[in-house]
Each structure stands twice: as C-alpha cells, then as structure tokens.
C-alpha cells in the first residue's frame, strides 16, 4: 500500500544500537515494496507510553514532524495529521523496566488508540475504510532480565493481542519470531533489550508481512 506511515515508539522503533539504515523502520523505508510511501520514524530512546501520548498529541496537531522522514518519490507533501494513513504503535518496554504493571501499560496503550481515533472524528471501521489504519505491536522479549520482568511483558502482550482481536486492529507480532530465533540459538540481541542487526531484520520481516496485508 502506498501511504504515509507514522511509527511511534521508543528506542526499539528508533533502531538503537545498530548502524544507520539497519533499524527495522529504515529497512521498510528502503524496501521497494513500499515505493512511493513515506515512513516517519518517531522513535525516541527511553520514551514511555505517556511520552508517546504527549508526542502523538503534537503530531496530530501538526506541531511536530519526524526529524528526517524517509521519503521516496511520488508522495505529496503534507503534515502527518492530514496525510497519515497508518499509525504503528510499539511501546511499553521502558515502562516495564521502570517497574510498571501490565495493566498500567495496557491502559496507556488504550489511551493512545483513543487519541488517534478521536482526533479523526470517526470510529475504527470508518478509519479503515478511508485508509487511515492503526497497527499495534507485541513487544520483543527482554534478553537481559535480571529482575524477572519478562512475565509482566508477556502479560502485557497478551492484553494487546486480545484487544487487537476484539477491536479488529492489525497486529505485528515481534515477540514470537525473536523468541524463536533466540531459542534456536541465534544471537539476535546486543546483550540487553535492544536487537542487533539480525534482530532488527527479523522485526522488519514481521512488520513487512503485516503491512503489505493491509
């Protein structure tokens, strides 16, 4: 689908820890399957779900743009709130690392979804019919987990999955392919919560498959 994509998240969306061009959003931006589309990477290292909410308010009021949106030929200029077709939400890892619960994270995610839908003045069915979609994503597992926080992350992911199914929202599963690759013995992390180049490539493949199905 030729569209404008807004990727809102933290360092996992930003592509922290790998050379420029190897984050999953950047890989999508340079994939010919998305030629003519615009990829706006609004990932900020260390951000929380509340921070994402605050930034989404500014994005929708056209006060903020991604510093360097990845653009390819054929896309008309315009601000994100007017031209955006797809919003992709990936957040909560930093909240969990700060000791927040799965319930807290889920309520914040619901707030983000509500803000997006309310800003356009229409319900989800109308959003999809007009090409203004919403995608939520499951968090990758924590590779370094000294405080046993993966169970909280998994509970949060379960809530996201159920919510997406009940609301009919598109869902990117980043958790399963990264866990399976790690369990298989592949090194897909930099030694902490951030994927390495292979890990981001796996995320890119999962995102590409979902986005092309919309």
Regions found by a protein language model. Give the residues of each.
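Serine-esterase "nucleophile elbow" of acetyl-processing enzymes
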Residues: 1-62
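Alpha-helical cap/lid subdomain in secreted, periplasmic
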Residues: 57-214
């Amino acid at each position: 689908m030729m569209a404008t994509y807004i990727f809102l998240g933290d360092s996992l969306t930003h592509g922290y820890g790998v050379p420029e061009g190897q984050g999953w959003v950047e890989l999508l931006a340079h994939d010919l399957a998305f030629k003519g589309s615009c990829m706006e990477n609004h990932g900020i290292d260390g951000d929380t779900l509340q921070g994402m909410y605050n930034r989404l308010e500014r994005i929708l009021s056209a006060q903020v743009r991604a510093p360097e949106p990845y653009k390819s030929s054929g896309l008309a200029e315009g601000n994100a709130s007017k031209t955006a077709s797809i919003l992709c939400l990936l957040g909560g890892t930093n909240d969990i690392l700060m000791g927040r619960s799965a319930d807290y994270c889920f309520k914040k995610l619901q707030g983000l979804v509500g803000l997006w839908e309310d800003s356009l003045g229409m319900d989800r069915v109308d959003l999809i019919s007009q090409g203004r979609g919403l995608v939520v994503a499951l968090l990758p597992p924590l590779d370094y987990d000294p405080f046993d926080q993966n169970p909280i992350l998994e509970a949060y992911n379960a809530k996201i999955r159920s919510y997406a199914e009940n609301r009919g929202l598109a869902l990117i599963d980043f958790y399963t392919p990264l866990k399976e690759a790690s369990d298989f013995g592949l090194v897909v992390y930099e030694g902490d919560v951030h994927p390495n180049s292979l890990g981001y490539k796996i995320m890119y493949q999962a995102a590409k498959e979902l986005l092309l199905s919309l």
